[in-house]
Amino acid sequence: MLLSGGKPPAQEWFMVQTKSKPRVHRQRLQVQRIFRVKVTAFQSRPDTPYFWLQLEGPRENTGKAKEYLKGLCNPELWKEVRYPPVLHCAFLGAQGLFLDCLCWSTLAYLVPGPPGSLMVGGLTESFTMTQNWLEELVARLRWGPAPMITPRGVWETEVTRAFGALVWIRCDKYAGDLLQLPPAVQELLLSLVRDAAGKEDIIEWLGHFGISGTCPNPEILICLARQQKESASLVTIKESPGTLQEIGALNRASENSKKTTSSGAAGSLTQAQSPPAQETADQLARDQSNKQGDETNSVGEEGTATQDTSSQDSENPTQALLQQKQVPKNEERISLLLPVSALSAYTSWKVWAPGTAFGPSWPGTIAATFWKINELQSLHLAWLLSQACLNFPFWQRPTGPIQLKLPGRNPLPLKLEWKQKELVPLSSAGSPACRPGGDLGRETALKHSPRPEIPSKIISLSVVPGGCGIKEKVSPGLLQVGQSSTSVGDKGISLSDCKGLEKPFSLALSTEQGGSTAQERPLAQVPEAPTVSETLQVATAAEVSNVEHPPTGEGLPATPKVPTALKKPAVYTEPTAPKVPSAPTEPAAPATPTAPQTPTAQKTPSVKTLAGLQTPKVQSETIATAGSEVPKAPAASAVAGPTVDVAQLLSEVQASKNRAIMLKVQGKPGRQGFQPSSTVPSRSKHQFLKEGLLGAWEGSQRLSPHSQGTNIVTSFQRYNEALNTPFEMNLSEEPGNPGLRRVVIDGSSVAMVHGLQHFFSCRGIAMAVQYFWNRGHREITVFVPTWQLKKNRRVRESHFLTKLHRLKMLSITPSQLENGKKITTYDYRFMVKLAEETDGVIVTNEQIHILMNNSKKLMVKDRLLPFTFAGSLFMVPDDPLGRDGPTLEEFLKKPNRLDMDIGNFLKVWKTLPPSSASISELSDDADAEPLEDPQDVEEAGKEEGSLEEEPGIPKPDEEDEQDTNPVSVFGVECPSFSEEILQCLSLHDPSEGTLDIDLLPVVSSPYLDVPWDGKAPCQQVLAQLAQLNIPSNFTALSFFMGFMDSHRDVISDYEDLVGPLHGLLKQKPDWQWNQEHEKSFLALKRALVCALCLSTPNPNLPFYLEVTVSQVSLTASLHQEHSGRKHPIAYTSKPLLPDEDSEGPQSGGDSPYAVAWALKHFARCVGDNPVVLRLSYASRTTVDNEAWDSRRASKAWLIRWSLLLQDKGKRELELSLLQGLLGENQLLTPPSSMPRVFQPLPPSSDLSTFICVHVSGYCFYRDDELCAGFGLYILSPTSPPVSLAFSCSPYTTTYAHLAAVACGLERFGQSQHPVVFLTHCNWIFSVLWELLPLWRVRGFLSSDGASLPHPSLLSYIISLTSGFSPLPFIYRTSYRGSLFAVTVDTLAKQGAQGGGQWWDLPKDVPVPMVTPHPKGRKPNLLALQLSDTTLADIIAKLQAGQKLSGPSPFSSAFNSLSLDQDSGLLMFKGERHPRVWVVPRQLRRDLIFSVHDSPIGEHQGLEDTYKTVRLLGWWPGMQDHVRDYCRSCLFCIPRNLIGGELKVIESPWPLRSTAPWSSLQIEVVGPVTVSEEGHKHVLIVADANTRWVEAFPLKPYTHVAVAQVLLQHVFARWGVPIRLEAAQGPQFARHVLVSCGLALGAQVTTLSRALQFPCLMSSEAYWEFKRALKEFIFLYGKKWAASLPLLHLAFRASTTEATPFQVLTGGEMKLMEPVWWEMSRANIEGLKMDAFLLQLMRELLDLHWRVAEKASEKAENRRFKRESQENEWSVGDQVLLLSLPRNGSSAKWMGPFYIGDRLSLSLYRVWGFPVPDKLGCVYPSSLMKAFPKHDTPLSLDVEQ
């Protein structure tokens, strides 16, 4: 093969993974079509996971196809791209041309979704190119048209004309939308096509390019047969949703011709749309759209792709047409089928019309094509057509032939008819056209798609050349490309020439049935056969219907839509019979308005039949199938018309009866799996005259040859006479009884019984449906096989099926034709499955239960409802299951399946042999009775009541009373489950004394009248269920699964639980029962017991929790009490492993951790309701005095623990408690209940209808002065874009952002359109969406009680949003570098630099009442001094007027000491310093910390720290103390340490200090159970002085990991301890401290000699905690790491010692629950201390200002107070965080991050760390520093 240039095609080879083979196979045809290459796959060796692909074609094409396939098989990106929905036509219009061109250009895999959505996949470069092209397309959408007088306007006019011509060539239902696009968009689309076509001729390129497989079926057919001379033309304009042929095929058909095909093809298009035809085309389309509504058809993607690239297309499809159709030399026939929306799956395309003329308007390759269009000389024909007919109104248009003088030699008689076309059901798969060997089977059939029920009324215009010998219109079919000249399509006729129209239709039929050599394709639009009497031959003109053909490969075609419009009555004529007035039309659906009729179709003469009988009125609402061969018979005329031999027809009637009798002898006609082909109505060449559509025989009389001469009454005669009685199925709209079962009707059985086993009487089905509808049933389903819907004269009154299908009550089972035999799917399977899944009954007379397997035989037998007909009455028995069974009322009522199905299951189980083989034998204790085998159960069951044996008969009253007792299973007073039930549900062997059971309540089934726990089953049923052993054979397992499957609705995760057992059923010969099957078996039984025994929790009642902990197991039960009884809610039991001493858990039943575990385990059931604890004690083997004493102590502890657990706020600590905090020690508000200020923008919203306000703020420092501003960029649907820039008060960047939002709210508060605010700052989005509602609830206060910044602005925003209805929307844009984001950022910078207007809060804005309430109490300065013995002695000396005796640190400064006269405080007055307070010993270190480590000092040097501390107080040796503290500060290293400098690790504590945190003990425990986060070890940290213990999970067990935990949670607040004991040894402790210095950035680290590292001799301080930790990890399993705070809470509550805060301050301060839950104890105590120090500093500053003697001293005091407040960090400030190393690297600063909440001066909650865009963890200020201030403009809202 050579290419056009004579070059051989290039080949590309590359490998593809085998897993991508299905994807490549699906896209192979599309790749070949778009890239015009040949794709061949070669399988590699079987052991290799890949295969080879060969691409053959032009080098450029193969390269592009290779890149496309790479992205298809291994997509680097696969995302959804959104665009305005108005551009949806650009991707689906022009028959997918633009989408394919875009795929060619970008090499991306494109899948159009709903309007406004496009899935783009492939390589990154392809995705980016597609995204850029879409952005340009969207941008051009907003370009308006240029004035015509400008060069741009002239250019756009030319572009519009060229685009219109291209759209006309590739016309489809999106043509109107495409022509309404702006010229700029059209230009971009044309450029896309031009680039894809390259240098190739556009028409030839379009022919090669083909039709897209992603768009609906192309709806244009151009058939061209050129001759040497051009003269008169035959133009047939008709709607054709049928087969298609690409324009490119015409080029290949005319390669031997000297003239190009493009000219002719384009010319035919121009003929149909001349300038005067523009208005007529609009009118035609408008009339059409009004009548057909949204009824559409579609062709699937696969079918279209296969059709375009099939092997048949590789041949020349037009050569056979040109050879068979011998057209006269002086004529040229051009068939142009007007594009309509009959095949589209979407709404009708909009009315459109191209430009007035197509001229040489656009340069390039397309211009040449459009120039050829204007060269044609056929415009006169289209103009004459528009002037002759289409300008008249619909009801005034002529219907007779119109003589027009055209450019040809002969005048053309023109006949126009507008007729109603109706939808018909799917064609039968048994028709010859759909046979595998048939002609039509070679093509891909049209795919079915659902359509509305509004009937389609389509205008059909036909122009026939004169002189053809046709006097009347005779079934004008569709000219099909590639079909035989005499072939009749599935419903249409192809005419070869004028003479062919004169031939009888029977010849065409026989030719078609005999098979055609040409390739045929099914047509979706066909004429409809008339309704004909069985005794007559000739029919009147019938109507035209649409039909769809399913693909031959499909086994179950989709259900068709059935029309509701009224049809004309069937009227029969005889050549010699006189004319009589026509019978009135009898509507089938009165509620449906009658469609307008043409004048000639309103009245039709009616005649008598041969027997002299009156032809009955019939309803012709019919269903057409694919079995009919000819859709339309020639119209009968009083002047001329073909005659048919009546005797021949009558003989055929008798033959059909004989064949029916033969079928009856062979088997029941309604149930034939394989049926002979003789039943297919294709026996005679006149068969099309007699059958037509399904239902053509309804209402007609069947007369045998002997009926004319005898008066014998037959059953068939009585049946036909009964059909004369009108019957209308009237289904009222009254609501039915929801307590009735679903009715599944066997349509074949009912129809054949009513039709005397000879006719398929649809009236019988309608009677059955009407009967059950009147009884109150609303869930009715009728099953009918597909082959019963084909055109068969035995099918009567099929309009009933039409109505049932429209009401969604008819289900059609699939069937097919194989070698002339009907193969019908076993429709019993469908009926049984539906009845099983919906608990319905089956209405049938067939004994289908004998055909079912054992698992469903019993169920089916009890669901069959027999019936019969008594004349016109449908009757069912009153005792469907026999006289001993339930009544009809009970049978049709939804039963409580529990009692009945359990009884049935037990009855079957009793008949099975005993089972002995199981993995774990179920046994009782030694003294218990052995379990009964099934035989014993059966004998005992015979003596029991009839509840199990006969579910329909009630038991005696006393038994009913016992069975309905809700607690009969457990006994009246027994609070627990029976031992038998528990033992049969345990995964462990019950003989070991431990059970592993977990029973939780299930959701009540919506299919039952009463909830599952409304009526407890009898105790006997549960006892027998508990005794069922594990099944040991296939039969027992089948029964068990059948029983469980009937209760699958109440078993959660049923499919997962039953999966192993399903797999075992498939291994019937290889029965291997293993542990997995046993677990599945027990899990299913456990789930069913939960449904039987557990009650639904009542949220209005308290819960009772009982926990029992023995040495080997933990048992917990949850129940509620009402009506004097206990109702179990949940139950759990699990084995426990013994500890090292083999004594079980810590203290038996009083284990607080067991209670905590049980409470958390039942949290889903308990919710927020109160829980009453009922604890049990387990017996001990030996009880010594110490244990007894500890038991008494633990009992007192249990009292406190129970009170703790009953506190609702404490139990909610398991949740994420950061949001919704109301205040100190108050309940938490869930986020869902907080009133929102904004609402999120719904996904897939159309922003074109919103007022879009893009906001941004900007802030920078200029000459140490803060400048701020913001910008607004507004897009409105009613006005052009607006850009605004403002300057605002110099606050922070957060204030600038919020001011932008407030300004936008002010401007659009009264807008009629919804408003959406768009921001690319994640912090502002979080503030507006999450934090602002929380701040409003908390009174605009932070967690430490301080006022939030800018409360007036926050309150102003809330007040503005309250005036919106609905609330304004908010949306966070993901792309910061987008055009709108850059624009609004530029506006914000312009405003900050003073280039915009000034904005400030209105003066009348009310200021919210914000009352800061600092944490802690006001410190007593005198009491603090008196707590220091040295200061108390000095105060006493001064009060007594004495001097110090003996050595004292205050001896040298005693003369500077004095007492304040007002307060009695000890004060110090130094030289050149103001008078200050003397600091007691216990507060000196903390006072230095508050100055040095807090944001006020930010780890300043020695001098600055000393000056600041000197303003707050004095003590002897103060300067040395400050120097030692600064030298030992670890966190000054990353700020002040110079590279290479030595860092000595020192402790700020004295050598023999007994203060808290000065002496620590650490131990690493593990490895333990791996947590979900991957933690394997636990670090225990204990304070030997305060007995404080805490645990931290560790992932890596390294020195650096331990150092990191200590730095963040202990050392950051309390410094390095003077004494560090490690259980791993002194060397481990030394390495930990060295790692601290190295982690913080020190190059060389040494340890001070003062530090002590003794060996840990005793772990008494945390021995109890370590013991509890092991038990806690075992109870919580893999979730222990996330639940450690619960252990801390429980252990802290049990301690009686004073807390560190009490040791330091002598008081206790309450904290909010989130702090207790999320923070370590060291940080919690540090938080308390920070609150105390803050109050202390404020009190000291007030004291010093009051005692100041000079004005300068007061000024210095106020300056320090003001600077300290300004330097404090607040919410919204930006900081940098010191990220500690994790893999041995040094620490580094990260950020900036926003402060989301302030807990104290040294503890903050950071937003965005460690989880982006979320309120993160608590961080100490020692590991934070302020974001640097720059002199140059710098945006402070930089994200991390």
Curated annotation (Swiss-Prot):
Coiled coil: none annotated. Gene3D superfamilies: 1.10.340.70, 3.30.70.270, 3.40.50.11980, Ribonuclease H-like superfamily/Ribonuclease H. It comes from the Eukaryota. It is a multi-pass membrane protein. Keywords: Membrane, Transmembrane, Transmembrane helix. Residues 259-283, 295-327 have a biased composition (Polar residues). Residues 284-294 have a biased composition (Basic and acidic residues). Residues 740-890 form the RNase NYN domain. One of its GO terms (molecular function) is nucleic acid binding. This is Protein NYNRIN. The gene is Nynrin.
